[in-house]
Amino acid sequence: MEIIPFGSADLDNILAREPQRAEYLPFGAVLLDRTGTILKYNRAEGGIANRNPADVIGKNFFNEIAPCAKGKRFHGEFLRFHQTGQVNVMFDYKFAYKGANVGVKIHMKSQPDGQSCWLFVKRV
């Protein structure tokens, strides 16, 4: 199994074919539906955010899990996806986490069917 690098152009296609590979990524991966509900939350993201992945499935990412991501840049990109079903953007972000700002790089990429999008999260 080849290593999939962060920011890979075809990462969404690989995970659409082989969804179990999300668990083996060396960075966080969160799959959201068009309403922001978490469909998948990999172990790496669980480690980054100190959360049990099973506990966040079915919750709204922006309202229940990461309200600090509801800022203009992060949530604005997601709202574009919500409206169009398409997104492929990479940006730096600082999560307010336990009283500290944690720097991350976000790659938000829609699935080919336009019904869900991945948030790939890498600490910087």
UniProtKB/Swiss-Prot annotation:
InterPro entries: PAS, PAS-like_dom_sf, PAS_fold, PYP
Modification type S-(4-hydroxycinnamyl)cysteine: residues: 68
One MF annotation (Gene Ontology) recorded for this entry: photoreceptor activity
One of the protein's GO biological processes: phototransduction
UniProt keywords, alphabetically: Chromophore, Photoreceptor protein, Receptor, Sensory transduction
Entry comment on modification after translation: The 4-hydroxycinnamic acid (p-coumaric acid) chromophore is covalently bound via a thioester linkage.
Record domain PAS: where: 22-85
Coiled-coil region: none
Protein family per UniProt: Belongs to the photoactive yellow protein family.
Functional note: This photoactive protein is a photoreceptor with kinetics similar to that of rhodopsin.
Protein name: Photoactive yellow protein
Species in which this protein is naturally found: Cereibacter sphaeroides (strain ATCC 17023 / DSM 158 / JCM 6121 / CCUG 31486 / LMG 2827 / NBRC 12203 / NCIMB 8253 / ATH 2.4.1.)
Gene name as annotated: pyp
